[in-house]
Amino acid sequence: MFPRIRSLTLVFILALFVTTVSLSLSQAAKPEAPGLAAWDQVYSVLISPRCINCHTATNYPQQGDDRHRHFANVVRGPDGHGVPALNCVGCHQDRNAESTGVPGGLNWHLAPLSMQWQDLNDQPLSSAAVCRAVTDPSKNEHMNGPALLKHHETADLVLWAWNPGRRPDGTMRTTPPLSHQEFVAATRAWVEAGTPCPKGR
């Protein structure tokens, strides 16, 4: 009888241990889940044409919702501002030029190659890869979570994505899939969750 009681006791203790570990792991995962859901929303904006066209992996910017190469063979240049004969601000002024359809914003330039969000075939990088780049201080100009939130909330070229003006044909450019307010809220939720990134390549 006693051996049976000991066996039952061991089974009970083992079951209790497994349950406790499972609950602990579940509770540990819960805070990350909302953060990852928030990141999914952030990612949907970052890979929209208004953002990814200037976060290229190539030596040139892109244009349009189809993300074709910038006309006139405009190139990145040494600092992302073009080259002397085709400097970005030569055409892109501080605001949209509604009469010509040329978009504009303060300090118009390409994002650095360290912040590329697409591959050399012009395809968006995975959510995990973009998240790693966005959260890597060596690539993102040394921004931590709060600095990223401020950047998304106030940077002129980020704000431009929701006020992109008209195309040369007079039609309105598309905006990201979230409103700016929703984008900032998603970024804040992601930052408050500790900027978790999806697993994978």
Short names for language-model regions:
Residues C51-H81:
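N-terminal, post-signal-peptide region of Sec/Tat-exported proteins
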Residues P49-T58, A85-R95:
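The canonical Cys-X-X-Cys-His
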